[in-house]
Amino acid sequence: MEELILGIVQGLTEFLPISSSGHLAIFTALFNSTPDVGYFAFLHLATFLAVLIFVKAEVFEIITGITKKETEYINLASKLVLSTIPAVIVGLCFGDFIESVFSSTLLIGVFLSITGILMLLSDNLNKNLKTIKSIPYWDALIIGVFQAFSVLPGISRSGTTLFAALFLGMNKEDAVKYSFLMSLPVTFGAGILELQKITFSSEQLFGFVISFLTGLLGLYLVKKMVIGGKLKIFGYYCFLASFFVIMFL
């Protein structure tokens, strides 16, 4: 049952800007069990498949453009790679510290409140000056730096990248696309690196399937909420979750 619940939590919260890693740690604490970072990463592979299906048209377009040696798609792919590098560096260099944070509900609560602040600010950022193809490399790096902070439980990956993209002037629909696309290498890499740490069971595989299905639902919801200017709802939720975690866990 625990694996099933964690699968649902991972699927829904991976793309909603409320921090999937933070919620996995919270529910693990509620179950009074030790955080299984390996299983958490395994669930990331499920949401990797969900986002790959959700943005399959964009991925196919980029791959086709690269094979045809079209400059705009080569540049876009290069920017996505650049956006990924900071998170990879942080994950490899500070993996042990990050894993230890999963056991600190106080820090998770603090980080959730930071995510909440970013979400409240995001709804007021609507410059619509840039598209996914027109952002400069410097912007791609900045968005990547924001994503790097999301390795900490309680800091939302989708929340930080959406905030950064909107702050830098990207239109809302393209900000969502860019956030989803740049999540692919990070979630895939994290899942593959941690696979060696888990022993597969039928319950964990079922949790994987549930995480995949709920991930598709989460993708649809976050796209609708961002375009509709309703990110503040997630901000208020993060504050409530932060209060609960700090006071009662």
Swiss-Prot record:
The chain crosses the membrane at residues 11-31, 35-55, 80-100, 101-121, 135-155, 175-195, 202-222, 226-246. One of its GO terms (molecular function) is undecaprenyl-diphosphatase activity. The keyword Transport does not apply. It catalyses: di-trans,octa-cis-undecaprenyl diphosphate + H2O = di-trans,octa-cis-undecaprenyl phosphate + phosphate + H(+). One of its GO terms (cellular component) is plasma membrane. Pfam families: BacA (PF02673). It is found in: Cell membrane. InterPro entries: UppP. It is a multi-pass membrane protein. It comes from the Archaea. Its EC number is 3.6.1.27. The keyword Transmembrane helix applies. Belongs to the UppP family. Catalyzes the dephosphorylation of undecaprenyl diphosphate (UPP). This is Undecaprenyl-diphosphatase. It comes from Methanococcus maripaludis (strain DSM 14266 / JCM 13030 / NBRC 101832 / S2 / LL). The gene is uppP.
